[in-house]
UniProtKB/Swiss-Prot annotation:
Span list, region NMP: 30-59
Residues annotated for AMP binding in this entry: T31, R36, Q57, L58, V59, G85, F86, P87, R88, Q92, R156, R167
Sequence similarity: Belongs to the adenylate kinase family.
CDD domains in UniProt: ADK
BP terms from Gene Ontology: AMP salvage
Organism: Methylococcus capsulatus (strain ATCC 33009 / NCIMB 11132 / Bath)
Subunit relationships: Monomer.
Stretches the record annotates as LID: 122-159
Catalytic activity, reaction form: AMP + ATP = 2 ADP
Protein name listed in UniProt: Adenylate kinase
Amino acid sequence: MRIMLLGSPGSGKGTQAKYLTERFGIPQISTGDMLRAAVREGTPLGMEAKKIMDAGQLVSDSIILGLIKERIAAPDCANGFLLDGFPRTIVQADALAELGVTLDHVVEIAVDDEEIVRRLSGRRVHPASGRTYHVVFNPPKVEGRDDETGEPLVQREDDKEETIRRRLEIYHVQTKPLVDYYRSKAAQGGVKFHTVPGVGSVEAIRDAVLASLA
C-alpha cells in the first residue's frame, strides 16, 4: 500500500504515520531522513546534496526525486511505503507522477487553523530536561514551573502564535492546493482520496484513517 498523508503542521500526521507504518509493515519515507542517510553514506546524490546544503542553499527537487526513486526501489518498499514531507507543491507532485511513482491512497487529516494554534501555542518546555507540558492538555502542577525542579518553563520560538500562523500561511499557499490536486486525480480514478477530521482522541482519528483505507 502506497500512502501519502496531507495535513497542516500540528495536525497529528506524524503520530498517524507512525501507526500506519507499524500496522501495514511499510517504511516511512521522509525526505529529511533520506538526505541525511545519502550524505552519511556518501552516495553520488548525497555528495551533491551535501555541497548544496554546505553552501546554505535548498536542495533541488531533482535531487529529492532521485533519492525517492532510489529509496522506493529498496526491498523493504516491495509492499508499499508512506511518503512524509514530499510532495509539498503541485510542481513536485507532477514531477513525482512523471517519475512513475504512483500512490494508492492520499489521506488529508483536516484540522482548522484556530485548533492548530491552540494545540501548538500551548506547549511549554523545561529546557534542561526536555520535559514538555501543555497549558490546556498537560499543565504543570504550578503554572509556568517544571514539576520536578520548580524551574521556569519556556515557550519555544516555533510554538509562538505568530510563528505558527506564518507556518500555516505557507502551508495554505504551497501545500493545501495538493488537496484539490489529488481530489481531482481521484475523480479520474488515479488514486483514492480521503479527508479525515483530525479532532478527537488519537485512537479515534487512527480508526477513521484505517476505515478510509479499507
